[in-house]
């Protein structure tokens, strides 16, 4: 089931590649396209609204708002066209005001205004503007919903190419619609001849200077406020669509340059971490440490995942170990015992071990425990950071060695000693963590293979060697030293915090 492998060296999965052949199908992608280059260690946070894709989404939302504004403004003026209409308004208003000999009937003028005089029919301009606003609204709404759906197809260069092309087409059409709308709602914009050759311009000029002003004539001869707002919104949409094209192309270029591996479309989950000791040291250096005393210098005793354990963090000791082979039972379910026995008792145990014949290595490598719930790693306590009963006695000792701070010079001296001890404390914790992580990894591996397999003996042998290493005087001295340093650092921290509070 598992091939026999040695744990004395790094795993085979790490190291420089031995060849540069074609990539296998395990990775799902090949070399970058020709002409592009990928920049390592340059993550692109595309989930932010300040990124190019975020700017595209924000501009699309702005286009939707402007389209709604255009629809509302233009729709509010349709009553003049369809309620009284060009025929009704001009038939009753213009025909009655100027007489039939000037324009003839109202119906003939309504057609003459739009066709005979070569102008733009206001009803047609309103309809064209509303149609383009609705088309732009639906297109940008579809693109925005697709971008927010977080599907794989919308996170590619092809999608933003479609955004670029569609936005460019909409910008061109919307520009034409805005110009046509201005020509339709403003009669003076389409009159270039004089009064004698442009009766409509003459009519509007006489209407402005007359004391009697028909409201229908005034509507068709002037630009209403809502019509002006609609025209301005049309040109703003053209500008926003051009910006969408720019940021869409910028998104495509970033994907091409940095590669999909460096593009982060979603925010990484935030992991809750404990108090950062180094951050506290910086605050102490700046004189701004006002943290609570209970935020100790705890160093996590929970081992990291075996998958995340560093592959080069530990080199197993020789098979001889720190003790003779007869001093330790082959069973792996014995919990760790502290080295509290007297030297005489230790010598007696050593003599008994010499008298007994040594066990064969294969037998010593056996570990009879099969229930993972009884794993001794769940019950052992290595170096701990919790408050113990002996801390109360240690506080008196540290209080005599490090009394309360009374000057800035003493505070600086405490801080320098704190920095030195902190480095040593973290180094000890890292060394012990590497051993514990390796033990947990081996324990899980022993649970996953059968005792009759050949690799079980090798794994169990290394597991027992690590257990011997944890019982060694060197490991126990490091464990005790880390505990002493932890209490010392905690005491110095309280002294510095108390001094900072008094000084204000």
Swiss-Prot record:
Modified residues (Phosphotyrosine): 379, 383
Cytoplasmic topological intervals: 1-57, 149-158, 250-504
Reported effect, residue 383 to D: Lower binding to TJP1 and TJP3, decrease in phosphorylation and loss of regulation of TJP1 and TJP3 binding. Lower binding to TJP1 and TJP3, loss of phosphorylation and loss of regulation of TJP1 binding
Keywords of this entry: Cell junction, Cell membrane, Coiled coil, Disulfide bond, Membrane, Phosphoprotein, Tight junction, Transmembrane, Transmembrane helix
Membrane topology qualifier: Multi-pass membrane protein
Cellular component, GO annotation: bicellular tight junction; cell junction; membrane; plasma membrane; transcription elongation factor complex
InterPro entries named among the record's database cross-references: ELL/occludin, Marvel, Occludin, Occludin_ELL
Effect of substituting residue 379 to F: Decrease in phosphorylation and decrease in regulation of TJP1 binding. Loss of phosphorylation and loss of regulation of TJP1 binding
Pfam families (UniProt xref): MARVEL, Occludin_ELL
PTM annotation, UniProt: Phosphorylated.
Region of interest (Disordered), ranges: 324-396
Region feature (Interaction with TJP1): 379-385
Cysteine disulfide links: 204-221
Biased composition (Basic residues): 361-370
Entry's transmembrane regions: 58-80, 124-148, 159-183, 228-249
Residue intervals of the OCEL domain: 396-504
Tissue distribution: Localized at tight junctions of both epithelial and endothelial cells. Highly expressed in lung and liver. Expressed at a lower level in brain.
Extracellular side, ranges: 81-123, 184-227
Localization of this protein: Cell membrane; Cell junction, Tight junction
Coiled-coil stretches: 412-471
Domain MARVEL, residue spans: 51-253
Oligomeric form and interacting partners: Interacts with TJP1 and TJP3.
Function comment: May play a role in the formation and regulation of the tight junction (TJ) paracellular permeability barrier. Interacts with ZO-1.
Domain comment quoted from the record: The C-terminal is cytoplasmic and is important for interaction with ZO-1. Necessary for the tight junction localization. Involved in the regulation of the permeability barrier function of the tight junction. The second extracellular domain may also be implicated in the permeability barrier function of the tight junction.
UniProt-recorded name of the protein: Occludin
